[in-house]
Amino acid sequence: VPNRTRPRSIPLPVLDAAPARDFLAEDSEKKEKCAVFGVWGEPGGVRLTYWGLYAQQHRGQESAGMAVTDGDHLLGHTGMGLVAEVFTERTLWDLEARPDRRNGARSATPIRGAIGHCRYSTTGASLSCNAQPIVENYIGGTVAVAHNGNIINASLLRDLYEQKGHIFHSTSDTEVVVHLLASPEQQSSPDPLGATLRRLQGAFSMVFLFPDRVEAARDPWGWRPLVLGEMPGGHPVVASETVALDAIGATTIRDVRPGEIVTLSDRGVESRQFAEPAERRAHCVFEHVYFASPASHLFGRTVQLVREALGETLAKEAPVDADYVMPMPDSGRSAASGYARASGIPYREGIVPNRYVGRTFIKPTQDERTTAVRLKLNIVGEIVRGKRLVVVDDSIVRGTTTRAKMDQLRAAGAKEIHLRISCPPIKHPCYFGVDFATRDQLIAHERSVEEIRKFLGVDSLHFLSIEGMLECSASAKFPAEHFCTACYSGDYRLDVEQPAPKGILERRQLKMFS
């Protein structure tokens, strides 16, 4: 049975703690998932991991963490908040100094490898116990794990191992993976990690840190991105997005293949398949629409170019006479520029974000939410007053904050508001790593476009078609059939009759004590 190393075995330094903070409600409609990073053999690996996470901060802002090894011991640090809050200069120095677990003496052995994680929770609450990487002792040694995705059979697996006497310290699906790896069934296999991954159902891009190596793995469907790169000195690195590799001066080599485990060690890069890739892949198209950095190259395309193409296609599908094309900051900018270019309507920015609002509201009331939205986005009255506007946004989930934004434009004197959305209506929940609301909270679930238009108070509303979206995302290497559109179409690649909702592991613990 694995034991959490934080209470014993490896003394962690007393580090500066960032305060836990909830996020502004308007950001909760569509949440980023997580980012992972790993490097082996590179001098300054701690700093590289820090910058690799910093470059992927858009994928998760609830917590961050890092684990390092000197070839003998593992040391980890996690905390709630942004990367720059969790890792102070003192924190990074402590990780680089590597306290020896026996006597706390400073080791002269250089750091051999590191992995990192920044998180938005999709299974397990936003609590410090769920921050990653998780560092555990088990019969095979010590391991640290960081995960992007969602294991839909995590609750069933946790039930199984609790009945066998395993003790869990968190409510995330990632800890379930560690218990699987530690079990005798997997440890008796010639490839314990591969045997572990074959037991998982769902989406995962993971990095594992052992004393002598980093291992990176991706599920057979390829839901979440994971890329392999190389530093100028030849040392290997992995990350969720290519933007992280660019930030540290690494060269992108290739994607980690679906069903593949890539090992980074002193022997270089080694590869093995733990499962055959699915015949029909399931690359998350919402990565192109919203989640990924515009600067990343993902699923065969540069994200910025995909988003501009989404806007161009939207202009062809839903033309309208207007004075200006206006983006909803920040995620609507790329599509709005494409719409303006294809339509010939001038591009103007009349909605200005206040970047200093959004992370200090703790459990706001509805009145506070409304005020927060007004503070978050300021309307330039002289630009919008008396004008017919095409407002472009990437998506609508619940619709309440979109309505508030449209009310602001109307109050500022906009003559007409034509809302254009660069993806189809989101009608179904995601069980594979995106924190979409339940069906009854999705505004497009069992509602027509006209009903949504009336609720939002706009003059016209159009969503991009699924076909138009896939035409923009697809490439010769990744044709349209290899993208997951379940949140739009309900076409799930795996059986989700009994899916694992985000809070299922918390509810299980509450039942135990009720």
What residue ranges belong to the model's regions?
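PRPP-dependent phosphoribosyltransferase catalytic core
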Residues: 197, 212-213, 249-255, 276, ...
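Active-site proximal loops enriched in glycine and acidic residues that flank catalytic Cys/His/Asp
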Residues: 218, 240, 266, 327-330, ...
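Phosphate/diphosphate-binding loops
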Residues: 195, 243-244, 251-252, 256-260, ...
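Secondary-structure transition/capping motifs at alpha-helix termini
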Residues: 166, 186-187, 319-323, 341-348, ...
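A conserved beta-strand->alpha-helix junction
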Residues: 170, 175, 347-358, 455-473
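Conserved short alpha-helical segments that host acidic/polar catalytic motifs at enzyme active sites
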Residues: 2-258, 263-322, 328, 416
